[in-house]
Amino acid sequence: MKTRLFLTIAIGALASFSLNGRGEELTATPANTSGEPATNAPMFQKLADAKWNKILPDLGDNSPEICILRVDPKTQATSLLIRTPKAIHVRKHWHTANETHTIIVGTASFACDGKRIELGPGSFNFMPAKMVHEAWLPANSLTFITVDGAWDVNWVEGPPTSADLSRAF
């Protein structure tokens, strides 16, 4: 019975997300809302079995996709993946919590605080909470992200649109 509960919680950690308002804030929500006690059991997830959701549904098949890997039930710290079917400029935004990016596939460009840098596979960066930043992600990129609190996106000038697709670095 405990194994079944652990598996249910582990699978449920591929949480859904909700778009609040007019897409100005994106928030990850934990899947375990059943009132069951949280667990510290190990969790394993194969990329091939990941559940992906569109971040910007208005962009249709061109939308970047998100896979919430795990949300800590106590702190709401979140581990997630983002992949991009098309190159996209992710407009200026900020997060309530500290955020890290590790590039798995592709070479992304990040800008913040008057600086811009390209990061390739294996590269890492840290964005302090509420630091306004933007990114240019290539087609078919994959980025691993951790957030030390609940994951959200607060757009400075609105979310990306079709005009931001395939925008050059």
Regions picked out by a protein language model, each given a short descriptive name:
Residues 1-7:
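Bacterial N-terminal signal peptides that target proteins for export
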Residues 8-16:
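Bacterial N-terminal signal peptides
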Residues 23-78, 160-169:
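A short, N-terminal "cap"/entry segment at the start of jelly-roll beta-barrel domains
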Residues 41-46, 134-169:
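Double-stranded beta-helix
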Residues 60-62, 73-75, 94-96, 118, ...:
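Extracellular/periplasmic catalytic domains that process cell-envelope and extracellular macromolecules
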Residues 70, 75-95, 128-132:
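Conserved short histidine dyad/triad with adjacent acidic residue
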Residues 74, 112-132:
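Short acidic-glycine-tyrosine-enriched beta hairpin
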Residues 85-88, 95-113:
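Glycine- and acidic-residue-biased ligand/ion/polar-headgroup-sensing regions
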